[in-house]
């Protein structure tokens, strides 16, 4: 009876009201983290007029010589620390950032702890860590604090709580990282939000292939396996269509890229080879470094 009533309410409730209700629930949870999130105001226009490189995990990145990025500001994303040249890229006397998306199912808390612990062993102390928090019961803030991780790194936290639904109207306040910000569908969206907030005038994307629909799971990324990515498709979509799931995911991600592109004067270019991402113009990496 209760299940039937819940379905009926969902069916007849306007989607915009559903999303606004979700945003309100998220905001109430955000208040617990408001004080640490507002510290992000320190990053406002910190790199005004500069350029940076966002490093993703798409397989095309294997074809690039990334060592010259030692002399560039980079945002290494999620599992990038497993790249063979990671230590050299993150060296040098220039700012380096390491960013992760908010944690989420289907991974267990143990898997996340193991992943962050391993990451802590590889990310050099000169790197500034940027972690995402959401309304999940187990979040990265708890994991980092309870396991004394990244104790020698400077850390910033952002809170992901604003739903970007089909008829969402962009508001600059929604991508103010010193407040509650978007719920994005991939870490590269969060990295772009940060880079724009920090004032970069040029942002270059590497390894943002978004062509997993064309590959089997073991070829999604430049590495074969991640500590936190075991049987991810099977655990996430179960018996559903992988093509349908991936297509919807790409649509949502590209819509978010488009929102940022349409509402920012920042030059964003894609250096990823063999990519489906056509929101941004392509430029060969060798021509800019």
Protein language model features and the residues they cover:
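Metal-ion/cofactor- or nucleotide/acyl-coenzyme-handling active-site neighborhoods
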Residues: 2-289
């Amino acid at each position: 009876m209760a299940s039937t009533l819940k379905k009926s309410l969902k069916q007849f409730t306007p989607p915009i009201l559903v999303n606004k209700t979700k945003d309100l629930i998220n905001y109430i949870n955000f208040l617990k983290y408001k004080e640490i999130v507002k510290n992000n105001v320190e990053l406002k226009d910190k790199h005004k007029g500069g350029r940076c490189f966002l490093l993703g995990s798409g397989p095309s990145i294997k074809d690039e010589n990334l060592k010259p990025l030692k002399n560039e500001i980079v945002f290494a994303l999620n599992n990038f620390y497993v790249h063979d040249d990671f230590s050299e890229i993150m060296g040098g006397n220039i700012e380096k950032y390491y960013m992760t998306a908010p944690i989420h199912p289907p991974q267990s808390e143990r898997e996340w702890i193991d992943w962050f612990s391993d990451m802590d062993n590889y990310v050099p102390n000169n790197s500034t860590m940027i972690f995402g928090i959401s309304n999940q019961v187990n979040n990265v803030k708890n994991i980092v604090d309870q396991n004394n991780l990244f104790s020698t790194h400077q850390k910033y936290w952002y809170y992901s709580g604003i739903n970007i639904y089909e008829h969402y109207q962009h508001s600059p306040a929604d991508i103010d990282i010193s407040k509650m910000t978007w719920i994005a569908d991939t870490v590269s969206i969060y990295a772009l939000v940060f880079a724009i907030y920090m004032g970069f005038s040029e942002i270059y994307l590497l390894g943002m292939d978004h062509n997993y629909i064309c590959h089997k799971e073991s070829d999604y990324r430049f590495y074969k396996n991640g500590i936190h990515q075991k049987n991810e498709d099977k655990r996430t979509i179960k018996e559903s269509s992988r093509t349908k799931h991936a297509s919807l995911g790409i649509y949502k991600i590209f819509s978010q890229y488009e929102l940022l592109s349409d509402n920012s004067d920042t030059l964003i270019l894609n250096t990823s080879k063999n990519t489906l991402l056509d929101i941004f113009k392509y430029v060969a990496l060798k021509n800019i470094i």
